[in-house]
Amino acid sequence: MSNPTSTPRADGFRMPAEWEPHEQTWMVWPERPDNWRNGGKPAQAAFTAVAKAIARFEPVTVCASAAQYENARARLDDTNIRVVEISTDDAWVRDTGPTFVIDDQGDVRGVDWGFNAWGGFEGGLYFPWQRDDQVARKILEIERRARYRTDDFVLEGGSIHVDGEGTLITTEECLLNHNRNPHLSQAEIEGILRDHLAVDSIIWLPNGLYNDETDGHVDNFCCYVRPGEVLLAWTDDQDDPNYLRCQAALRILEESRDAKGRKLVVHKMPIPGPLYATQEECDGVDIVEGSQPRDPSIRLAGSYVNFLIVNGGIVAPSFDDPKDAEARAILQRVFPEHEVVMVPGREILLGGGNIHCITQQQPAPRKA
C-alpha cells in the first residue's frame, strides 16, 4: 500500500472522535508470561469477554501469534469476531496499532507512530519491541489502507484523546517525557499532532493517574464524552496521591477553551480502590530480565475512565469494587443513548492497563 510523504492534514484527513461510527475494533491476544500471570490464561479469558462484549455492537478483529492462533480462534467463538495471525511483543493495540484518520471523500488511512515500549531504554517496560513497532503497518496492510509513518516521532494512542472537532487532550507527564521525544520541543510536538490529526487546540494536563506505568496516559485519566464535555477520574480524599493530580487537571480543564471556543463541562468519575495485586497474582508472572516486576505493595492504576465507545454501546471495566455501580450510573448518564456493558477488568489491570488500552477502533468511511 502507499506511504504518503505528506501529512494527513495536508491530504484532508482528520482523527475522528471515538463516538463516530466504527467499521470495526482491533485487539491483540495476550500471551506474554512475564506480563500476564499464569501463562496469560486469566488475561485471555478477560480479553475474550471484552471482545465478545464489543462484538454485540460491531465487528472485532483479534491479532494472535502463530502459537496462539488455534487457541484464540477456539475461545473467540463468535461470528462477529475475526482472528488474524500477527506476531507481536504484547497486547496493547491502543499504543501499537494505527491511529486511523478519515476524510470526507470516503477514504480511511492510518498513522503509524514510532513505538519504544513506553520509554525505550529509559523506563521502557520491555525489550525488544520491534514486533510491536510493526503492528500498525501490518494492520494497515491487511486493510489495504495508506500509511503515514513517523519514524522520528514516538507516540502511543493511549496518550491522546480528541473531540473530532479540532481539540486534543494529552498529558505533559507522557508527551513531554524525555524518554519519548527528547529531541523535540513542546511546540514541535504540537506541530506534529496538528499535522497528523488535524487538531487546532491542544489541552495539556500536567499528569495522568498515579502509578500509571505508561507515564500518565490520558486515556486512563480523562476522556471526551462528546464535544465540549469530558469525564475526569476523581477523588475527594486529600490523602490519596491522585488528589493533587485531579485538582490540577480540573483547574486546567475549567480554564481551557476548545477549538470551537467552548468552555468545557467536566464530569467526575470516582477512582476505584485503592487496588493492589495479591502476592499470588504477582507470583504467577514470570521473572525475566528487562521486564516490569510485579509487587503487591505497589498501587494499581485502576480507572473507570479506561472504557471504549462502540457503535451504540460503552464497554467499561468493573473491579468488584463498591464504586462499580456508581461508575455504571455515571456512564449511563453521560451516554444516555448508549448501552453500558461492564466487563471484569482486574486481569487486564494486572497487566498494566484496561479496556481502552487493549482496543483500537477503526472508523467507518464517510462522505460529506
UniProtKB/Swiss-Prot annotation:
Enzymatic class: hydrolase
This protein's UniProt keywords: Hydrolase, Polyamine biosynthesis
Pfam families: PAD_porph (PF04371)
MF (Gene Ontology): agmatine deiminase activity; protein-arginine deiminase activity
GO terms, biological process: putrescine biosynthetic process from arginine
EC number: 3.5.3.12
InterPro entries: Agmatine_deiminase (IPR017754), Peptidyl-Arg-deiminase_porph (IPR007466)
Residues at the catalytic site: 357
Catalytic activity, reaction form: agmatine + H2O = N-carbamoylputrescine + NH4(+)
Family: Belongs to the agmatine deiminase family.
Name recorded for this polypeptide: Agmatine deiminase
Organism expressing this protein natively: Pseudomonas paraeruginosa (strain DSM 24068 / PA7)
Name of encoding gene: aguA
